Amino acid sequence: MTALPSAYPEASSQMPAAAELACRMDAARLAEELSSVSVVSWQKQRTHVLGLDGESELGTTSPPTELEWRVLPLWSIGGDADRTDPGGPEDKGYAPTIWWSRLPCMREVVSAIPVPFNSVRLMALGPGASSDEHCDPKYDVRRGFCRLHIPVLTNPDAILVLDGVRYCWAPGELWYGDFSRLHRVENRGAEVRVHLVIDALMTSDLVQLFPARFRQSFEDHGALFNSFGLACADCRPWAHPRKFAIPRSFLNFTDDAPLETSEPKLSVELHYSDRNVYMKTVNGTVLAMTPVGDSRFRFSGWSDQRTVVVDDGSIVLESRFGHDRRTSRIFDQVDSDH
């Protein structure tokens, strides 16, 4: 995915692009466990559609890559073992796949990292495979996301080039990379390169594993730390669907500035049903929502970067990027039936 133009100041280039975190894994155990699923047919990597662009519907996935780049998902949207994409806002949240219970060492390793994780995937880059240079804007700590890598198998000729710097991370290490910057991967070796890739929500606890200079940089540039701990049952319910016309771009999750008032509007409904909260668009797309505060919700599969506050007679749309916070109050559309 290529970055879209942003209305926010560009600061990520001033932050370090990668860091080894203060956490080491048992590389031999990881490799041994990997061998137990090496005979399984891994599927090719796909990407996830994050925007309502008029052509591709939010929540759909791309065709499989032509590269020899295969995935075994351990956590995915709905726990679907066929989902090789990283996922995002959809009608359900993330859940373990059948492979999660069958790989106890990897389960232990991932669970020990102090983050709530979304997608967890084993990703295998075959010999001779190489990607085009690209960037993934989602994985910017100012958006509240981070992507972590634990190499399991590698070779000296299997590399990542991130922000112009060449990396070959060793098995058992835990690395953070700012994949919102330009990067590419290639494997010129004779052996497959396998990484355990964890897409997580940024937290203040995770930051403690970073080198000191990163911790200061995150503070300076407004890394977004997410909120947790509430259930929908803890929130004040509403009896009938709430109807609003919101900027269409608010549901384009590739857009860093989704609250422009000149944007075309999209009719949506907010539902509270059986202690579940979701947003439904006029074309039937359903997006599950998670509480992050009293009457404040984020989209499942997303971060606190984009939230909805439910008030009496209105909602407040919030968008954050680093230190920048933008809001827009939208009033209910009157429904004569209620």
Model-derived features: positions:
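Beta-sheet ligand-binding and adhesion/scaffold domains
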Residues: 296-338
